[in-house]
Amino acid sequence: MTLSWLSIFRLGLVQLCLGALVVLMTSTLNRVMVVELALPAVLPGLLVGLHYAIQITRPNWGFRSDTRGNRTRFVILGMAVLALGAFLATLGMVWMQTAYLAGLVLSVLAYTLIGLGVGASGTSLLALLATATDPRRRAAAATITWLMMIFGIAVTATVVGKALDPYSAERLLELVALVGALAVALTTAAIWGIERRHRSASPVPAEAPVPFRAGLAEVWAERRARHFTLFIFLSMTAYFMQELILEPYAGLSFGLTPGQSTQLSGAQNGGVFVGMLLVGIAATGLRIGSLRAWIMAGCLGSALSLLTLALIGQTPEGGALLLPATVALGLFNGMFAVAAIGSMMALAG
């Protein structure tokens, strides 16, 4: 039995929760550390980089959820660890004002937990989608879940940003705790029972689990999987490299205020949303182009958009092109992301 559209939407709520928590760590805390606390910009950059580096454990989380047969548990526990890490990261940032070393140590621990939580929850969720979704619905399923993640990012940033005005450390701690609690509760309610119904309707013979190293070696031996892995490594490095750079670049090169640069980031996420929606409709509904073609278009378009952003910063008249170039970058990022996820699920299936 494959997932219904309602079940796919429910799993998308988990992605929404992931986006809601992660954006607070990579955007809100980043700004507060650099602007309000006047800490070196390299510090939040390293902390955000740490949470991405920890996610190299994703293959192991996927393997564990596959072999132990309870992805729901990994999704819920991962979200709980992420929520705890988010609260501790906020607390560590507050401590840095009076006890810098203690706050830094707590922040390192917190961002480690954030990376583990995102890896466990996000990977197990995608594994469930890949194995339980009808092949004809995979591109649409990827689009729905990732659109909901972008939606969660946009809504959380907007609501929390308004609630934080005027800023206070106590208020930020309260908001992060509230978002974390809501994320864990919504994740539990959204995913509960989906995997059990799919497993009971599609029984498979029990097999002895393959050891992780043996399974990894088997996958790596497959030419398509190996090449796709290397491609994703390179492309996602480029995809996330601009995350902590775009807003400072807009301020330094074009004189945008923090509010204006935040709006620029929102415009980029709007482009990502449209790009994902475009590929979902075109690839699944209208049968236009293959996922491979959409991936290539997304990568080439992203490269050209990023090059344009770099070049317009060298000319006085370039400010007029900043917004359209940023939206275009988001559009092509979204096209690439959802097509790549769809291709990954096709390989897994």
How would you name each of these model-derived features?
Residues M1-V35, T112, W220-Q242:
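Pair of pore-lining "gating" transmembrane helices in MFS-fold secondary transporters
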Residues I54-R58, A139-L164, Q268:
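Glycine-rich segments within core transmembrane alpha-helices of 12-TM secondary carriers
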Residues M79-L101, C299-E317:
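C-terminal ends and interior cores of transmembrane alpha-helices
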Residues M1-W5, E195-T229, S253:
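Juxtamembrane intracellular "pre-TM" segments in multi-pass secondary transporters
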Residues I56-N70, L164, G275-R292:
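Helix-to-loop junctions at the C-terminal end of transmembrane segments
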Residues D66-L84, Y100, T284-L300:
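Cytoplasmic membrane-interface "Motif A"-like loop-to-helix N-cap segments
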Residues S27-L43, L244-T262:
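Short amphipathic helix-loop junctions that connect adjacent transmembrane helices
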Residues R292-A340:
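C-terminal transmembrane helical hairpin of 12-TM major facilitator-type secondary transporters
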